[in-house]
Amino acid sequence: MHAKDGIMVHKFHTSQGWFMSTGPSRKQVKVTVVGAGIVGSAIAYSLARRGAAVTVIDKGRPGAGATSHSFAWINATAKHPVSYHNFNRRSLGMWDRFAKGLGVDVGLRWGGQLEWASTAVGAYELESRAAQLRAWGYPCQLLDAAHMAHIEPGLSPREVTAAIYCELDGMVEPTLAAQACIQAAVKLGAAAKLETQVTDVMNNSSSATVVAGGETIDADVVVLAGGVDNTVLAAMAGITIPQEESPGVVIRTGPIAQPLLSNVSVLYAPSLEPGRPEIHLRQCLDGSAMIGEGSQESLARDDTQAHADELLARAAEYVPALKGAAAIPVPVGYRPMPLDGFPVVGFSPKSPNVYLALTHSGVTLAPLMAQLATMEIIDAAQVDLLSNYRPSRFD
């Protein structure tokens, strides 16, 4: 057992001897990554950096699936229990270095998340959340209306019974990040087979095979990072990975020249009326706004223009700079959501040459999942940090 980057890992015996060889004669590991969303793209890039012979396959373009629908709030604020909170916090802390390594601007911006309540019940909930986050060592300031106005003077918040500011949180443009990962991986020698449908995944005695676009592709390891498609992909290899259906709706605006927020990256505002969802907002790299409602797990299917117009009008009540912007509806997106809500990461005992990488909060978790998956595939490590998230829990 030894430590790497603060993570305890164990070497284990495997029939796949190429894992264990060292020095100049070490065999190059062949890996096929199915899925070029933010998680799959990050894994492909990380593997390519370690010298693996990587082939990435996606039925569409990089970052064009659930990744493109993500609100892309990088955080550990809304994560429970503490073990999962810490898992997300570790990945949050990796984003700066990860993004810089890509060599292009992927819209990574820090500034924190600001949220406020307008009722006594809402204030109690925020106060309780702030206390819990601080107990876990996560900076979270409890604010009154005056302090909130100092941080974001351009808001029109109406009633403020309490507010919290989580300064570590940030945002990124996940499609740009996925595209940059694939481009970087290709520069390192990876092959990208895009707009190519996978029709079979097979585990062999010492390898794994993918059939895609009529072509049979053999590899030492196949990584399944297909998001909502992972349940079907895993079943091809005899692995059970159940997911909940998790539709979500966000809207965008056209580019807005002026900054909508003075300091923070992400804004969460209370409902304007009892029984209506809360509103969340961020301004994208191109100046457009992305707006959603409810929590990041809320289910929504209304992607009509009427809904987009109404949601923008509600957001503009709190953010006057939005007035006059045009609402652009985005088709409903389906988010990866393992049945118990937690990541599914690792080799499956049922198909030991198939590696699963599935999670909600993929934008926050992509750097960490990429690092740990690479360690387990290239170094034959068993990472203790992943022990709660193994595919075998669904067997």
Q: Language model features by range: what are they?
A:
Residues 1-31, 49:
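Extreme N-terminal leader/targeting segments of oxidoreductases
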Residues 30-55:
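N-terminal Rossmann-like FAD-binding beta1-loop-alpha1 element of flavoenzymes
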Residues 45-49, 72-74, 105-108, 216, ...:
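Active-site substrate-recognition segment that forms the wall
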Residues 49-68:
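Glycine-rich FAD pyrophosphate-binding loop
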Residues 71-151, 278, 300, 306, ...:
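Dinucleotide-binding Rossmann-like beta1-alpha1 core, especially the glycine-rich loop
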Residues 106-117, 141-145, 149-188, 294-298, ...:
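Helix-loop-beta segment of a Rossmann-like dinucleotide-binding subdomain
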Residues 166-218:
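Helical element adjacent to the flavin cofactor pocket in flavoenzyme catalytic cores
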Residues 310, 316-395:
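C-terminal catalytic lobe of FAD-dependent flavoproteins
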